[in-house]
Amino acid sequence: MTKREEYELKAEQLLTPIMEENNFELVDVEYVKEVGNWYLRAYIDKEGGITVDDCEVVSRRFSDLLDEKDFIPDAYILEVSSPGLGRQLKKDKDFKRSLGEEVEIKLYKAINKQKDFEGILTDFDQEKLIIEQADGTTMEFARADIAMVRLALDF
């Protein structure tokens, strides 16, 4: 386990009781370096959508716990926000919630010179995802071959 993964896991453990107390869902936690700064980001959601006030409540509690546990030696910026419209799908609960929705899939390696696919998520399990494309064809992808899945944005 990398340090980054260790920090993300510990952050998830600190966030879990805060999420349960407020009936929020922890969508994702990431510890990343961007433009020379480290960021610890928590993406939260709830039925009906998350508000700025919800993010503030979680941020204050989470910040206090992070200060108390002090497991990240680097300076970092804490951000708590909603996952946004084009949220990535990572966990089974994300896929379950998104059944019947249009998704974008990006693969690590191309299939017939194509890495990007789009379609309606029709099924999934631990090993694979299945989508129905606009032309009605069904495609199955091994989860191990998928770099990223997110909800498709239609404007």
Curated annotation (Swiss-Prot):
GO biological process: ribosomal small subunit assembly; translation
Database matches in InterPro entries: Ribosome_maturation_RimP (IPR003728), RimP_C (IPR028998), RimP_C_sf (IPR036847), RimP_N (IPR028989), RimP_N_sf (IPR035956)
Keywords from the UniProt entry: Cytoplasm, Ribosome biogenesis
Listed GO CC annotations: cytosol
Cell compartment(s), UniProt: Cytoplasm
Function in brief: Required for maturation of 30S ribosomal subunits.
HAMAP family named among the record's database cross-references: RimP
Similarity remark: Belongs to the RimP family.
Listed name of the protein: Ribosome maturation factor RimP
Record organism: Lachnoclostridium phytofermentans (strain ATCC 700394 / DSM 18823 / ISDg)
Taxonomic lineage of the native organism: Bacteria, Bacillati, Bacillota, Clostridia, Lachnospirales
